[in-house]
């Protein structure tokens, strides 16, 4: 059986790898993509997502989502992904367009049509998911689970404690984490371990057309380097769906700080149960790195 998934994304260079895996992993059935402002503006993330779908000739509907966070000014990660979000490769022109409805309504409609509950995968800020849950609460029974790339049980990557996807819209993340749906959180604790080695990166141009494209993008990606290895943050969310045995998870109570002067966007992960609150998130805390690297090599070899 193929696992049906909807993917909410903000491409982004490592998003491109995650999208490739979502399309080509034989265990998955990617049925809908939605975009959100995050790494770059939503206009750019939508353009990038459509370019990738055209590159792979993938007939997957795509809806453009939120352009700004729920209540605060937008921030981006152009310093990591470049101003366009996917600099380094010249994609061919196409005439693909997004659906004519907002992302959260596209997700709602697709959930209500689905014959079984669907797994949502969110690898950008959680604005679209928060809009779905707050505006369309009738959809909750149709969500099997939500798997996210975001958060951290320890250090952050855009502030001392906050990870970018959560910090970009803390109010949205807080809404999602309070929603009661099943959540699997793949945060920096595992994604900082998810490194593609220089030796493997050097093989990509000869792998296939996807490898050549990704190698060109990686030369502009600033989450590591081609000489030291590159962190594949977003890919971890897809990897968990296919190879959950590679991850060590612990059910924890997780809250999102929205008010702190220095801690806004922090995921407060109660690993030891100090707060006495019931767990609401399965938090990934460790990764089988060699197993992850082997799986990445296998799935990208299929991405022709």
UniProtKB/Swiss-Prot annotation:
Q: What is this protein called?
A: Non-specific ribonucleoside hydrolase RihC
- PROSITE patterns from the UniProt entry: IUNH (PS01247)
A GO BP term here is: pyrimidine nucleobase metabolic process
Q: Which Gene Ontology cellular component terms are annotated?
A: cytosol
Is Hydrolase among the key words of this record? yes
One Pfam family this chain carries?
IU_nuc_hydro
Annotated membrane-spanning segments are none
Q: What EC number(s) does its UniProt record assign? A: 3.2.-.-
The alphabetized UniProt keywords are: Glycosidase, Hydrolase
Q: List the disulfide bonds.
A: none
Function, as annotated:
Hydrolyzes both purine and pyrimidine ribonucleosides with a broad-substrate specificity.
NCBIfam families reported in the protein's UniProt record: PRK10768.1
Family statement: Belongs to the IUNH family. RihC subfamily.
Question: What GO molecular functions are on record for this protein?
Answer: purine nucleosidase activity; uridine nucleosidase activity
Per the Swiss-Prot or TrEMBL record, the active site comprises 233
């Amino acid at each position: 059986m193929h696992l049906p998934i909807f993917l909410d994304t903000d491409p982004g260079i490592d998003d491109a790898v995650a999208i490739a895996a979502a399309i080509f992993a034989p265990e998955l059935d990617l049925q809908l993509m939605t975009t959100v402002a995050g790494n770059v503006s939503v206009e750019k993330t939508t353009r990038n997502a459509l370019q990738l779908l055209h590159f792979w000739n993938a007939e997957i509907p795509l809806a453009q989502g939120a352009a700004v966070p729920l209540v605060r000014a937008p921030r981006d990660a152009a310093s990591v992904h470049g101003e366009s979000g996917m600099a380094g490769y010249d994609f061919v022109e196409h005439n693909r367009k997004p659906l004519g409805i907002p992302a959260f309504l596209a997700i709602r409609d697709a959930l209500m049509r689905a014959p079984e509950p669907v797994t949502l995968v969110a690898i950008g800020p959680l604005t679209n998911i928060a809009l779905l849950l707050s505006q369309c609460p009738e959809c909750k029974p149709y969500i099997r689970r939500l798997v996210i790339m975001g958060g951290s049980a320890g250090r952050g990557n855009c502030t001392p404690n906050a990870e970018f996807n959560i910090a970009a819209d803390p109010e949205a993340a807080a809404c999602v984490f309070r929603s009661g749906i099943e959540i699997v959180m793949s945060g920096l604790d595992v994604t900082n371990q998810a490194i593609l080695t220089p030796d493997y990166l050097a093989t990509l141009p000869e792998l296939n057309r996807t490898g050549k494209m990704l190698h060109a993008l990686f030369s502009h990606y600033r989450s590591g380097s081609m000489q030291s290895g590159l962190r594949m943050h977003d890919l971890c969310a897809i990897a968990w769906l296919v190879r959950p045995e590679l991850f060590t998870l612990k059910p924890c109570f997780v809250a999102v700080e929205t008010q702190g002067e220095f801690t806004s966007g922090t995921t407060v992960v109660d690993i030891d149960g100090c707060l006495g609150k019931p767990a609401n998130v399965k938090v990934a805390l460790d990764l089988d790195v060699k197993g992850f690297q082997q799986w990445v090599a296998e799935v990208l070899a299929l991405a022709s």
